């Protein structure tokens, strides 16, 4: 088990995500540490360009697809941080992205994705309905789907 973990850490360290993300610091959370009488540290992924760790997985997956399969258009479904990660990654790699988001997605998330020049399709009342529409769109147009969580290259 440890050997596999070490291989995985090496794979992460060699990842090309550092083309677009920072090596975010780990900082002591003083008030939390005092409250819980223990040292509590925070990994500052809020300092990433999209203010979330989700950009790491999105960029890793898309960069691998561009490199291996020369894709020029990707699709995802998300109501938030993954959508922003895919949009940012697509823009950085100069490819198209279509993002399916539930109609209930906060407007600030929709606007952030649009700012990155991705096409946004608001559909359905929840994530599952947006996901279903995205998968149908991928099948019809023969495009790769970037799953927000069910893909080892995204985790």
Predicted features and spans:
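PLP-dependent amino-acid enzyme catalytic core
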Residues: 1-155
């Amino acid at each position: 088990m440890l050997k596999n973990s070490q291989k995985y850490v090496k794979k992460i360290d060699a990842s090309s995500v550092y083309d677009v993300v920072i090596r975010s610091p780990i900082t002591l959370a003083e008030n939390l540490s005092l409250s819980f009488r223990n040292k509590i540290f925070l990994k500052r992924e809020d300092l990433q360009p999209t203010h979330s760790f989700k950009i790491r997985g999105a960029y890793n997956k898309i960069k691998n697809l561009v490199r291996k399969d020369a894709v020029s258009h990707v699709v995802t479904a998300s109501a938030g941080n993954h959508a922003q990660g895919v949009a940012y990654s697509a823009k950085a790699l100069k490819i198209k992205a279509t993002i399916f988001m539930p109609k209930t997605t906060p407007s600030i998330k929709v606007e952030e994705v649009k700012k990155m020049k991705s096409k946004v399709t608001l559909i359905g009342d929840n994530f599952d309905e947006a996901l279903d529409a995205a998968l149908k769109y991928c099948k019809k147009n023969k495009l790769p789907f970037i799953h927000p969580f069910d893909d080892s290259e995204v985790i």
